[in-house]
C-alpha cells in the first residue's frame, strides 16, 4: 500500500514538472549562422566580428569593453593594445574611441591613445613632485618623459593645474618653462654671491658654469639683482665687468694719457677693452685725437711738439728726427703715419718737407745737399757727347719714331715677309747651320766666338730672319729706352760724405733716388745742347768709328782666308761662303747703315739681310747705290771680289783701307788663340768643347786662324790628322763619335745616353789637355 502511494507521488511530481517546463527547440550551429546572416542582410542586427571571425559582439558591448580596458590600464589605453586584447579590428576600435571621446568630455583621444581625467590628475601630481625636487622644469623635458604632445601637456595638464595641483609659476619670457619661487630665490642668491666676488672681467659662461644657473635665467634676474657691474652683451662671448675694474681701467688710461699725451690700442686692449677707439672717444669727449693704426695722439702732442718742430725745421733749412720728439715706443710705421696725417691736416706746407725713415728733411736742405750733383750732371753730359753715347741714343730714338709712324702698312709687311722667306730658304741651302761634313757626319754645335771688335760682335752663325723681323717689329712698337746719363751710385757717392757727418749715411741712396730723374733730365738737356752745338764734330766721329770697324773686319777676313785656303775642294768653297755670310754680311750692314744715315733714311733693323739691304740701297743717293749693290752681289762670289767691291764702297764713303801690318797680324793670331783657350776652359758642353779643341789644334799646327761652324769639325780633324800621332787621333775620333751619339739621342734619360755622357766626361780632360799643351817644333819656334 505504501509503495503504491509512493508511485502516485512520483507521478504527480513528474506531471507538475511537465506543466511548469516550457518547450524548447534546440538549433544547430549552421542554423544559428544562417539566422544571424539573414538578420544582418536585412539590417535588423548590428554586430562586430572578431579578427578570426568566430565570434561577434554588438557595438554597445564593445564600447563597454573599451571603457573597461581604459579603466584597467589606469586611465591611459593604447588603441593598438586594446585591439589586440579584444581581438577586434583596429579601425572599429578607433571609431568607437572617437565616439567615446566625443560623448565624454572627461576622456581625451590623443595620438592613438585614450586618456581620462584621472590619469591627467596623476600626471599633474608627478609633475608637481618633479618641480619641487628640481625647482625648474620645461615642457620639452615632460614631453620626453610622458610621451605626450607638448601642447597637450602645456595646456591640458600644466597650465590647467598650475596653482592647484602644481605649485609653481610660469616664466614670462618663456611660457614653456615653469619654476618654483624657491628656485628663483636660490638662483638670485647664487648670482648675487658670484658677481660680488668677481674683481676682473669674466666670461658669463664661466660664471654660469660655476654656479650652475641657466643663461636665460641669469639675464632675466640680472636687472632685479642690480649688481655692481655690467654685462657687455647677451651673446655667447659676453663678459661681466665689475664697476671697480672699470674704474681701475679709467684711472690707468687717464694717468697714461696725462703723462704721455698718446694712447696705444694694444695697451687698452690688454685691459679687456675690445674697441679702443670708441673707448678713447667716450673717456675723453672734450679732447681731440689723431687716430692712427696703432696709437692715438693727443692734440697737445701734435700742436706743441710735432707742428712746432716742423716749422722750426723749415725756418732753419735743416732736418728733423721725429723719433727724438715723439714717444720712444712708437715704431717707424707709426711715425710715418703721424707725419702723413699732420701733412694731410695742413698744419704745415707738405711741399716744404721730405720724409725718409723717420727723418724729415726741409726742401731747402736737400736742395743745398744735391747742389754739387748738378755740376756732375753737366760733366756726364759732356762725356756722353765725347764718346758718342748720346749720338747713338738720338739715332736709335729717331729711327724708332720713324718706324712707328711708317711701319705697319700691309703692303710693306707682305713684301718683307716674302723677302725674309726667300732669304731663309737660301740660307738653309748655303749656310753652315745645315748640311753634312766631308765624312757625311753633322756636328750640331754652337758657333765659336770669332776675333772681332765693335758692332761686328754679333752671333753670325744664327743669322735668323725671324729675329730680324721680330726686332724690327718690336722697334716700331716700343720707344727707345730713355738714356740714363746719371746713375744713382754717382749721386750717392757725392752726397754720402755730407750725410755721414750727420750720421745719416744710410739715407744717401733714398735721397739719391729722389733726385735721380731730375738730375738725369738735366744731363740729357745739357747733352742735347752740346749735340746741337757741334753736329759736324759728331759726324766726323761716326765716320771714323765706322771706318775703324770696317778695317778691323777686313783684317779678320784676310786672316781667316789664309786658314781656309789650306783646305781643298768643296770644303774650302763652303768655308768661303760661311765667312762671307757672316763677317762679309757685317761689313755690308755697317756700310749700308752708315750710308742710310747719311741719306736720312729710316731703317727698321740694324741686322739686315741681302734683300733688305737691296731695298734700302735703292733709296740711297746715286753716288752710293751702284757700289753698295755690287758689294751685296759679291757676297755670293769669291773673297777677292768681295774685297774689291768693299774698297769701292769705302771710296764712295770717303774712307780709306789701312795697309797690311804682318807684325800686328801675328799678334791678332796669338790673341785669337788665347780667346779660344779661355773659352775652352769655361766650356762644359761636349760638342762645343770638341769644336774649340779642333780650332785650337788647327791654329797651333798651321799658324793660321779659321772661321768655321760646328759642321766643319770633322773636316778640321781630317786635315790635322797627319800631324797628330795615333793615340791623339784615336782620342779625337772617339770623342767625336761620342758627341755624334749624344746629338742623335732621342731620350736623354736612357741608360745608353747616360753611359755615353759618362764616357765623354772621362775623355773631356784628355781632350782639353791635348788642345792646351800640343805643340810642334816649327810652330813653337815661329811663335
UniProtKB/Swiss-Prot annotation:
One of the record's GO cellular component terms: endoplasmic reticulum membrane
EC number assigned by the record: 2.3.2.-
Cysteine pairs bridged by disulfides in the record: none
Region described as Disordered: spans on this chain: 406-476
Keyword Transferase listed: yes
Alphabetized UniProt keyword annotations: Transferase, Ubl conjugation pathway
Composition-biased stretches (Basic residues): 446-457
Domain of life: Eukaryota
DNA damage listed as a keyword: no
InterPro entries linked to this entry: Ufl1, Ufl1-like_C, Ufl1_dom, Ufl1_N
One term of GO molecular function: UFM1 ligase activity
GO annotation, biological process: protein K69-linked ufmylation; regulation of proteasomal ubiquitin-dependent protein catabolic process; response to endoplasmic reticulum stress
Pfam families, sorted: E3_UFM1_ligase, UFL1, UFL1_C
Family under the similarity heading: Belongs to the UFL1 family.
Biological role: E3 UFM1-protein ligase that mediates ufmylation of target proteins.
Protein name per Swiss-Prot or TrEMBL: E3 UFM1-protein ligase 1 homolog
Organism of this sequence: Drosophila grimshawi
Amino acid at each position: 500500500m505504501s509503495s503504491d502511494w509512493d508511485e502516485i507521488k512520483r507521478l504527480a511530481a513528474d506531471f507538475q514538472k511537465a506543466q511548469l517546463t516550457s518547450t524548447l527547440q534546440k538549433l544547430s550551429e549552421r542554423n544559428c549562422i544562417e539566422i544571424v546572416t539573414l538578420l544582418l542582410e536585412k539590417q535588423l542586427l548590428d554586430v562586430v566580428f572578431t579578427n578570426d571571425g568566430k565570434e561577434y559582439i554588438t557595438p554597445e558591448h564593445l564600447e563597454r569593453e573599451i571603457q573597461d580596458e581604459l579603466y584597467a590600464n589606469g586611465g591611459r589605453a593604447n588603441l593598438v593594445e586594446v585591439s589586440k586584447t579584444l581581438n577586434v579590428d583596429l579601425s572599429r576600435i578607433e571609431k568607437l574611441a572617437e565616439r567615446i571621446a566625443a560623448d565624454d568630455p572627461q576622456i581625451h583621444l590623443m595620438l592613438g591613445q585614450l586618456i581620462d581625467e584621472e590619469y591627467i590628475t596623476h600626471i599633474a601630481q608627478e609633475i608637481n613632485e618633479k618641480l619641487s625636487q628640481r625647482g625648474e622644469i620645461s615642457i620639452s623635458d615632460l614631453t620626453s618623459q610622458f610621451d605626450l604632445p607638448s601642447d597637450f601637456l602645456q595646456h591640458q595638464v600644466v597650465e590647467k593645474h598650475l596653482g592647484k595641483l602644481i605649485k609653481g609659476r610660469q616664466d614670462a619670457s618663456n611660457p614653456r618653462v615653469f619654476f618654483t619661487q624657491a628656485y628663483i630665490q636660490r638662483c638670485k642668491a647664487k648670482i648675487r654671491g658670484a658677481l660680488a666676488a668677481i674683481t676682473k672681467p669674466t666670461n658669463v659662461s664661466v660664471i654660469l658654469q660655476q654656479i650652475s644657473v641657466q643663461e636665460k635665467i641669469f639675464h632675466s634676474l640680472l636687472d632685479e639683482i642690480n649688481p655692481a657691474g655690467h654685462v657687455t652683451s647677451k651673446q655667447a662671448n659676453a663678459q661681466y665687468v665689475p664697476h671697480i675694474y672699470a674704474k681701475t681701467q679709467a684711472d690707468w688710461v687717464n694717468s697714461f694719457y696725462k703723462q704721455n699725451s698718446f694712447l696705444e690700442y694694444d695697451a687698452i686692449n690688454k685691459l679687456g677693452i675690445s674697441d679702443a677707439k670708441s673707448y678713447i672717444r667716450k673717456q675723453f669727449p672734450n679732447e681731440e685725437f689723431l687716430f692712427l693704426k696703432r696709437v692715438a695722439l693727443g692734440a697737445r702732442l701734435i700742436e706743441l711738439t710735432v707742428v712746432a718742430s716742423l716749422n722750426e725745421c723749415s725756418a732753419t733749412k735743416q732736418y728733423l728726427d721725429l723719433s727724438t720728439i715723439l714717444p720712444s715706443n712708437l715704431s717707424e710705421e707709426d711715425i710715418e703715419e703721424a707725419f702723413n696725417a699732420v701733412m694731410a691736416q695742413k698744419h704745415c706746407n707738405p711741399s716744404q718737407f721730405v720724409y725718409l725713415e723717420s727723418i724729415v728733411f726741409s726742401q731747402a736742405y736737400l736742395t743745398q745737399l744735391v747742389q754739387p750733383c748738378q755740376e756732375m750732371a753737366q760733366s756726364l753730359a759732356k762725356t756722353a757727347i765725347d764718346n758718342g753715347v748720346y749720338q747713338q741714343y738720338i739715332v736709335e730714338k729717331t729711327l724708332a719714331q720713324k718706324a712707328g709712324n711708317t711701319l705697319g702698312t700691309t703692303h710693306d709687311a707682305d713684301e718683307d715677309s716674302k723677302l725674309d722667306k726667300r732669304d731663309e730658304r737660301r740660307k738653309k741651302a748655303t749656310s753652315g747651320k745645315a748640311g753634312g761634313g766631308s765624312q757625311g757626319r753633322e756636328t750640331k754645335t754652337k758657333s765659336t766666338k770669332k776675333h772681332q771688335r765693335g758692332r761686328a760682335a754679333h752671333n753670325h752663325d744664327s743669322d735668323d730672319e725671324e729675329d730680324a723681323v721680330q726686332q724690327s717689329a718690336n722697334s716700331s712698337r716700343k720707344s727707345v729706352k730713355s738714356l740714363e746719363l746719371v746713375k744713382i751710385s754717382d749721386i750717392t757717392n757725392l752726397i754720402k760724405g755730407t750725410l755721414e757727418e750727420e750720421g745719416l749715411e744710410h739715407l744717401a741712396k733714398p735721397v739719391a733716388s729722389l733726385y735721380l730723374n731730375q738730375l738725369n733730365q738735366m744731363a740729357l738737356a745739357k747733352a742735347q745742347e752740346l749735340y746741337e752745338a757741334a753736329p759736324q764734330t759728331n759726324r766726323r766721329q761716326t765716320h771714323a768709328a765706322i771706318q775703324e770697324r770696317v778695317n778691323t773686319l777686313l783684317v779678320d777676313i784676310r786672316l781667316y782666308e789664309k786658314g781656309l785656303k789650306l783646305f781643298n775642294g768643296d770644303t774650302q768653297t763652303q768655308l768661303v761662303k760661311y765667312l762671307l755670310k757672316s763677317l762679309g754680311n757685317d761689313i755690308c750692314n755697317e756700310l749700308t747703315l752708315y750710308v742710310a744715315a747719311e741719306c736720312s733714311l729710316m731703317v727698321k733693323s740694324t741686322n739686315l739681310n741681302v734683300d733688305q739691304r737691296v731695298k734700302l740701297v735703292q733709296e740711297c743717293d746715286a753716288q752710293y747705290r751702284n757700289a753698295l749693290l755690287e758689294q751685296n752681289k759679291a757676297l755670293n762670289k769669291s773673297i777677292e771680289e768681295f774685297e774689291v767691291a768693299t774698297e769701292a764702297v769705302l771710296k764712295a764713303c770717303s774712307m780709306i783701307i789701312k795697309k797690311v801690318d804682318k807684325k800686328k797680324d801675328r799678334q791678332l793670331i796669338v790673341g785669337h788663340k788665347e780667346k779660344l783657350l779661355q773659352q775652352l776652359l769655361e766650356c762644359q758642353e761636349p760638342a762645343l768643347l770638341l769644336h774649340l779643341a779642333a780650332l785650337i789644334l788647327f791654329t797651333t799646327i798651321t799658324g793660321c786662324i779659321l772661321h768655321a761652324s760646328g759642321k766643319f769639325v770633322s773636316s778640321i780633324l781630317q786635315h790635322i790628322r797627319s800631324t797628330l800621332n795615333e793615340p791623339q787621333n784615336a782620342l779625337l775620333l772617339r770623342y767625336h763619335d761620342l758627341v755624334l751619339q749624344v746629338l742623335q739621342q732621342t731620350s736623354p734619360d736612357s741608360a745608353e745616353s747616360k753611359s755615353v755622357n759618362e764616357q765623354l766626361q772621362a775623355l773631356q780632360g784628355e781632350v782639353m789637355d791635348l788642345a792646351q799643351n800640343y805643340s810642334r817644333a816649327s810652330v813653337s819656334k815661329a811663335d
